[in-house]
Amino acid sequence: MAGDSFGTLFRFTSFGESHGPAIGCVVEGVPPGIPLTAADLQHDLDRRKPGQSRFTTQRREDDAAEILSGVYEGVTTGTPIAVLIRNTDQRSKDYSDIAQRFRPGHADYTYWVKYGVRDPRGGGRSSARETAVRVAAGAIARKVLTSVLGRPLTIRAAVVEMGGLAIERANWDWLSVDANPFFSPDAAMVAPWEALLDGVRRDGSSVGAVVEVVAEGVPPGLGEPVYDRLDADLAKALMSINAVKGVEIGAGFEAARLRGESNADEMLPNGLGGVRFTSNNAGGVLGGISTGQTIIARLAVKPTSSIMIPRQSVDTQGRPVDVVTKGRHDPCVGIRAVPVAEAMVAVVLADHLLRFRGQCGLPVGL
């Protein structure tokens, strides 16, 4: 199976299945001499791990990261870093009924058509369980960014809409994000979303969400025209996350409704020999290259396909069947997509920063 790696200079390859003994990744391109321990990975992994509230899957996993290589006495050596996360709470019997049936909305059918074989236990390789190792790789990417830039680069995400109920942007407060089970920047939306998901769970159904990712402190100049544009790589990274069906950068699809004079971000002297922008419809990227403004991306996450409501499908013999997905599933998988989205943005930025350094030296201002 191809397509298991992401990145160019900063590159990671993931492996493992949802109900296998472990999942993991191998991260390449990390410069030597960067302080790194398993604890650096664990903070982000703990934000993503399941079973932390009634609004996520009740599968219990510690998601404890083990660094197997590439680090000596707490410092990176420049060699590949292997990270292992053991699976400890699999319940494969929950999937015995669908071993020969294709679940609507899942990758069951497409994996079967392509490979002629699939692992039905929890979705196997296509499960969102794989995203844990993306978060581990993203934590390493954050360390690379800080080391190369000589300063922190802030990457944060939040759920801005769930089940059609959107936040009030005037209430945006980053301090609220980690203070509630929804990663909501609007504390006033916690109660409505609780009521929404409680009802969805009772119905045996699910809802989708919109996640917004913001990267602040990105230096200008990251990105490679024409086919390795920064925004194109960000879109690919975010679209590769399970259940994501759409990505927009900056104003995104709203830009199609604007006139030219409203959409193009005007520039003025910043008094320091550079420029400042009067708006940020571009989302921090022009011509595929970062402008130095805040990078803003949004991703649409579809409703979890594993639901208790019977749906029509076919089995591996082409016969009509009804499918009900048992097991422990997220009523809104968009919640736990927040740290995953942050991680993928970190990976892209680390990759492009190393590529910039290799071609041009350090970015302007560093």
Swiss-Prot record:
GO terms for cellular component: cytosol. Pathway: Metabolic intermediate biosynthesis; chorismate biosynthesis; chorismate from D-erythrose 4-phosphate and phosphoenolpyruvate: step 7/7. Its EC number is 4.2.3.5. The gene is aroC. Reduced FMN (FMNH(2)). One of its GO terms (biological process) is chorismate biosynthetic process. CDD domains: Chorismate_synthase. Pfam families: Chorismate_synt. This is Chorismate synthase. Gene3D superfamilies: Chorismate synthase AroC. It catalyses: 5-O-(1-carboxyvinyl)-3-phosphoshikimate = chorismate + phosphate. Keywords: Amino-acid biosynthesis, Aromatic amino acid biosynthesis, FAD, Flavoprotein, FMN, Lyase, NADP. This reaction introduces a second double bond into the aromatic ring system. Belongs to the chorismate synthase family. FMN binds at residues 125-127, 242-243, 287, 302-306, 328. PANTHER family: CHORISMATE SYNTHASE (PTHR21085:SF0). Homotetramer. It comes from Rhodospirillum rubrum (strain ATCC 11170 / ATH 1.1.1 / DSM 467 / LMG 4362 / NCIMB 8255 / S1). One of its GO terms (molecular function) is chorismate synthase activity. Its cofactor is FMNH2. NCBIfam families: aroC, PRK05382.1. NADP(+) binds at residues 48, 54. It is an enzyme of class 4 (lyase).
